[in-house]
Structures are given as structure tokens and as C-alpha cells.
């Protein structure tokens, strides 16, 4: 279960000003295991900032996120590696999450090695399964992100996030541009 407690975040209006604008006003919510939730709002309403705070990528000004009762922020908090195993985010700009010098296969295999310590042959087999799930040809295994289209890079980011077998998967408009059958297939996984 993920609990958002009085979470808020603001950003500076510029390098030469002390003025700040509020990206996320204090918000509290509970997301139970097994549920599917949507955070909707207008452009600029703070959806991405909220998602990044839940994922542990953006420190809030106030409040906290609890994963199974353990804080994400503060002195007594969940270990970063454990957090990233439990919560994965696929961001709007998926290409920024990919190492430009790492092949697609190695990128997808990295969570399998880091979190599950799988043998190389087992990792490669699981990687190929995830690539098939995300409609990526197996011969993309040895390609670099720069050799793929934006949509293909997004599918690699999804396969990589699924490789961690997270309890919570956050899509920040990550399936935009995908056809309905592929969206459904990814959401079911």
C-alpha cells in the first residue's frame, strides 16, 4: 500500500528570484495494492511532480510517502534499492531514462540482475519475453537507444520497468501514442 501524507512541492520561479510557485498543494491519498488509479488534471496541475515524489525522484517540501508503512523521505526511511524495486515510473520523456551507451538488452536486463541476481541465460530469456510483450523485435537486443524511434524507446522503458516486477507501476502518460491493443497488453502485465 502507498500512502501519500500531506505532500506538497514548490519550485523557484527563476535563478535570480526568491519567488516560488506551488507545483503540488498539500495532498493526501491511499493507493491500495492491486488497485488501478488515475491522477487526472489540466496541464501544469502537478501530476508529474506528484508521480515523481511517489517514485522517490523528487523530494517534497513537506509531507511524506509511505510504502507499506515505511517512509520514503526522512531519516528513518526505506532503502533506496528496495523502494525502486517496489515502485517504478515510466515518464513522459522515456528516452531520458535510457543510458545512451547501453544496449537495449542490457538496459532491460539491469533490473533483473540488480534486484533478482539472475544468471545471464535466465536474464536474457526474461528480457526477450519482456521485449515480445512490448512489441520489440528480439534483434533490437544489441541496438542502442539512438537507433530506435521515440515510441520504441518508450516501449524499452516500459519493458525495463516491468523487469523489476514492481508492486506499483506509475505511468506518466507513458502509453500516449500506442494503439489500443498494445496499451491493454501492457496494462494487463
Give the ranges of each region predicted by the language model.
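ABC ATPase NBD coupling module
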Residues: 18, 72-88, 106, 114
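Conserved ABC ATPase "signature" region
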Residues: 122-139
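Conserved ABC ATPase signature
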Residues: 144-148, 152
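Hydrophobic anchor residue at the start of the ABC signature
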Residues: 158
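Conserved catalytic motifs of ABC-family nucleotide-binding domains
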Residues: 165
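Catalytic Walker B motif of ABC-type/P-loop ATPase nucleotide-binding domains
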Residues: 169-172
